Amino acid sequence: MNDKHLPDASAENPWLPLRQLTPARIALGRTGTSLPTRPQLDFQYAHAQARDAVHLPFDHAAISDGLRQRGRDSLLLHSAAADRHVYLQRPDLGRRLDEASVQRLREHAAGYDGQIDLAIVVADGLSALAVQRHTLPFLERLEEQALAEGWSLSPVVLVEQGRVAVADEIGELLRAKMSVILIGERPGLSSPDSLGLYFTWAPRVGLTDAYRNCISNVRLEGLSYGMAAHRLLYLMREACRRQLSGVNLKDEAEVQALDGEAPRTGNFLLARD
């Protein structure tokens, strides 16, 4: 075999400088026809982190304690999925509360006079790690702004083994105008702790994803807590004005100024004049 046709033993990728701009796995280089050892080990480590995030138990007590220190009440409920094994194999059960939780929430709602503007739900989802890292700092920013604007908020409802649609049942039982659920997103190989927010106007059992607005990738390396709260409050205002949410309600929140730039709206991917 002619040696000149063999690949270099180790070769860098010309895209290497782009790695400064993204955590995505690009420009990994090669050794012969394979990945170098370091990127291969990094991949295996990231995969292990993602698996751990899915199976990490939900430390709801820590979140409840943090809320209590800020003078906020919480309520612990459980979905109809009895454990993690059932939760992963039966998504439908994660979308509804178990009977004991339904009864407890009904009793709790009976003590309310008037209507709650926003029911706040926190569920472990597919990454309890995301919920435990980001719930308290995000809620601190959201609640400060929401209360300043005069919105009435429910106690924070914590749900074990919950999926997105469980917030519909909770919002309906609380007779809330709107609901938002903070939930751990499916872990990626570069983001095992990504938090998602799902917002719904007039929550009720049976709604599809078309009736929800999603704000995703809330974490330090993604969408900041402040910007996520800013976008959610915009959706709340517009939902109340237009009496709807989901595909008919677009997120056109004004992007806050950075480095002295004027605020702007629209798609940040489009070139600016």
From Swiss-Prot:
Note accompanying the cofactor annotation: Binds between the large and small subunits.
Reaction(s) the record says it catalyses: ethanolamine = acetaldehyde + NH4(+)
EC class of the enzyme, as a word: lyase
The protein's annotated pathway: Amine and polyamine degradation; ethanolamine degradation
Entry's EC annotation: 4.3.1.7
Keywords in alphabetical order: Bacterial microcompartment, Cobalamin, Cobalt, Lyase
Binding site for adenosylcob(III)alamin: V164, E185, C214
Molecular function terms, GO-annotated: cobalamin binding; ethanolamine ammonia-lyase activity
Listed cofactors: adenosylcob(III)alamin
Keyword set includes Zinc: no
Cell compartment(s), UniProt: Bacterial microcompartment
GO cellular component: ethanolamine ammonia-lyase complex; ethanolamine degradation polyhedral organelle
GO BP term, example: ethanolamine catabolic process
UniProt xrefs under NCBIfam families: PRK05465.1
Self-association and partners: The basic unit is a heterodimer which dimerizes to form tetramers. The heterotetramers trimerize; 6 large subunits form a core ring with 6 small subunits projecting outwards.
Function text: Catalyzes the deamination of various vicinal amino-alcohols to oxo compounds. Allows this organism to utilize ethanolamine as the sole source of nitrogen and carbon in the presence of external vitamin B12.
PANTHER family: ETHANOLAMINE AMMONIA-LYASE LIGHT CHAIN, ETHANOLAMINE AMMONIA-LYASE SMALL SUBUNIT
Similarity comment: family membership: Belongs to the EutC family.
Protein name as annotated: Ethanolamine ammonia-lyase small subunit
Organism (species): Pseudomonas aeruginosa (strain ATCC 15692 / DSM 22644 / CIP 104116 / JCM 14847 / LMG 12228 / 1C / PRS 101 / PAO1)
Gene, per the UniProt record: eutC
